[in-house]
Amino acid sequence: MALGSNTKFYETPNHPFQGERIADEANLIGRYGLKNKEELWRAQSELRGYRREARKLLGSAGEHETESEEFLARLKRYGILNEQDQLDDVLSLDVTDVLERRLQTVVYRKGYANTPEQARQFIVHGHIVLDDARVTRPGMTVETAVESSVGFDEHSSLSDELHPERAEAQE
C-alpha cells in the first residue's frame, strides 16, 4: 500500500469501556445486522463529517451558498434528509438515519430478506442487483432514486418466487 494512504475510515470511541455506549452499540449492531462495531463506527464517522460540514457552512452564512445547496442536495438525494429539511436539520441527525440508507437495510425493509443478517448474506453472495448491476457491498449507501430498482438478480436461484429462503411478503 502506498505511503500516506488512509486505510481507516472511522474513529474509535475515546473511552474503551463505557457500559451504556457498549449496550447502545450492541443494540444497533443487532437491529441493523452489522458485522462488527467497525461498521457502526464508520457510520458514526460519516455522520460526524456531515455535521462538521453543516457547522462550517452555517458559520459562514451567505458566503458559501452554492456549497450549502449542493451539500443539502446530496443528503436529500441519499434520503438522509427530507425535501423540506434545512441546513440546521443536519445537526439533529442520528446515526440511525445513516444506517437506514445502507443497501443491507434497504433490502431488508423492502422485504427481500427475513432478517438484516440474511439481507447481508444475499448481497455478499451476489443475489441482489441495483439498477441491473450486481452489488456485493452491504454497506453501500443507496440513493432514493435507485431504491426502487433493488431486486433479485435474474440469474440467481432466489429470483424464483417459490424459493424456500425468500422472505414472506411483509406488510
Swiss-Prot record:
Keywords: Ribonucleoprotein, Ribosomal protein, RNA-binding, rRNA-binding. Pfam families: S4. One of its GO terms (cellular component) is small ribosomal subunit. CDD domains: S4. It comes from the Archaea. Residues 152-171 have a biased composition (Basic and acidic residues). One of its GO terms (molecular function) is rRNA binding. SMART domains: Ribosomal_S4, S4. GO terms for biological process: ribosomal small subunit biogenesis; translation. Residues 101-165 form the S4 RNA-binding domain. HAMAP family: Ribosomal_uS4_A. Part of the 30S ribosomal subunit. Contacts protein S5. The interaction surface between S4 and S5 is involved in control of translational fidelity. This is Small ribosomal subunit protein uS4. It comes from Haloarcula marismortui (strain ATCC 43049 / DSM 3752 / JCM 8966 / VKM B-1809) (Halobacterium marismortui). The gene is rps4.
